Amino acid sequence: MKRNLALGVDIGGTNSVFGLCDEHGTLYFEESVYTREYPTPEELVDKIYERIKSVGHLPNVKGIGIGAPNGNYFSGTIEFAPNLKWKGIIPLARLFEYKFKVKTILTNDANAAAIGEMIYGAGRDLKDFVTITLGTGLGSGVISSGNLIYGHDGFAGEYGHVRVVPNGRLCGCGRKGCLETYVSATGVVRSIHELDSKHSETSELINLKNPEASQVFQLAEDGDKFAVEIIEYTAKVLGNSLADFTCFSSPKAYILFGGIAQSGPSFAKKVKGYMEDALLNIYKDKIEIRISELHDKNAAVLGASSLVWNELS
């Protein structure tokens, strides 16, 4: 194979996924490893190198893109990621460059998703949009005039830690009331136990030992009144917050990414409704809510690899 390829790497607290794709988003190889099996980042880099070498694609790799928690674009480091076994500041981009001898770009996973949408997905026709990643937590990547906003230190876009409820739910960051404690898979599950509802005692949710967000959405579709209230509340918190975010970002669209976003069009429609109700008049009816077009199974690798093509363009 003589086609130029980018190696995309998504570092997760549980699993890390890596794969090879071309500038059109065609995936040629993908594999997942258990992150915690590697006591040091050097050992993980060695593993990925040997796998890419073994499948015969090493000469085709023209660059490496990495999406990682607390990833800093400017320094190429992972900084104090709470969900990783490796502590402190990890110079991961430098480790990959030393091993592979190619340019390596690192940023956080939400920023990688935003670039992925711009290169391959729902943001291909947009120059100003915000990707909202809805997973265990909530992240965001802000694209303005076709460029990702990193801020002065590489950590712009921590939208999940905007406080939406004064003295609200305790967040993993140590603060209270952060958006991701309400709008995320974890936030949806917390609402089962924390929302005061006259319908809670008759809901099937109460009988679930370890409920998941996907079950809440499914029960809402089936008409469970308490589940409907939870989804409505989640959409309202997000919609109101997006209306505030619009005041200083003024995007053409918000692109919802992740499991919650893929739960069905009704959630996005609810978010849109609450956002419109809360928007200033100058922004009304101007902003779209779109669903990610990146295939959920390959989204992490595509997002990471897109960093390479964006840098080379």
Task: Report each predicted region and the residues it spans.
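ATP-binding/phosphotransfer module of carbohydrate and carboxylate kinases, centering on a glycine-rich
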Residues: M1-G63, Y73-T77, A93-V102, I119-L126, ...
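Conserved A3 ("GATE") glycine/threonine-rich loop of ANL adenylate-forming enzymes
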Residues: T14-N15, A112, T136-G139
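Residue-level detector of high-confidence beta-strand sites
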Residues: E30-S32, A81, G151
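A generic structural motif
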Residues: V33-Y34, K85, F155
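A charged helix-plus-loop insertion that forms the helical arch/lid used to bind
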Residues: T77-I89
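General beta-strand structural signal in soluble alpha/beta enzymes
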Residues: T104-N108
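Glycine-rich phosphate-binding loop of actin/hexokinase-like ATP-binding domains
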Residues: L126-Y182
